Structures are given as C-alpha cells and as structure tokens.
C-alpha cells in the first residue's frame, strides 16, 4: 500500500492543528505557511477531515480550523481512512464488494489479509496525541512538516 499525497499531506495538516491547538482556531493560511501545502489543496483535505468529524471550522474574524475531538481520541487510521478511503492493499479484502470471482479460492488472499490486518493494527493504535508528543521530542521548537520531507 502506498499512500497518496492526500494521506501524507492531510496527516501533516491535522498534526499542525494538534500541535497548535492552544492557539484557538487556526487560519488555513497559517497551516499552509508552516507545512508548505497550498491553501487550495488544504481546503480539499480539510473538507474531507470535516466530513469525518475530525476537524471543525469556526467562522468569524478569529475563525479558522481546529480539532473536532480530543487528539487522544483520533487515530492515524481515522485520519488516513477519511482521506484515502479503505486502506486494504487489494480489492478482494477491502470493505467494498470484490469483483474477483476466485476470491474465496485464492491462496494469496491469506497474505493480503495479514498485510491488511497489520496495517490496520498499526494505524488504529497510533493516536494523534502520540505524534504530537513525538514531534516535541524530536524538535521542541518547531514542528518539522517541510513539504520536501516525508
């Protein structure tokens, strides 16, 4: 499984919101400035995160975006699925109906299922709050979300 820029940049954007959560609602231009993600692309990402009830918008002069839930309640899996959809490596084990006629007889399906289980376990047990703590340990003065980095 390879994540698209939606998943990678969306995770950076919500991590920026989490790191800066004590500053009230955060303008999308501020997120863009810190992460190097264009405002237009951020608007698309934030829209998906809002639909998944991970981010909320605040209107007005001091408006912007903030987390909709506590960061201890938001998993990386929640974020990635909101942006990418199902994380299954192959169609036959996704939550969607498979078009593969031999899915029930497929020996390699066991491999794909184990990979899927491992991915889901990893992203569902890693919370946004853990990423915030890790970012503070790595660089307590600046969140490293440079667009040229992973």
Where would I find each of the regions flagged by the language model?
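A short alpha-helical element within helix-turn-helix/winged-helix DNA-binding domains
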Residues: 30-35
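Conserved segment of winged-helix/HTH DNA-binding domains
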Residues: 71-96, 108-109, 113-117
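C-terminal regulatory/oligomerization modules of transcriptional regulators
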Residues: 94-150
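Short amphipathic alpha-helical interface segments
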Residues: 10-22
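Basic amphipathic alpha-helical segments that dock to polyanions
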Residues: 45-50
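Beta-hairpin "wing" of winged helix-turn-helix
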Residues: 54-62, 66-67
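Residue cluster at the C-terminal edge of the helix-turn-helix DNA-binding motif
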Residues: 51-54, 82
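Key DNA-contact positions within bacterial/archaeal DNA-binding proteins
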Residues: 40
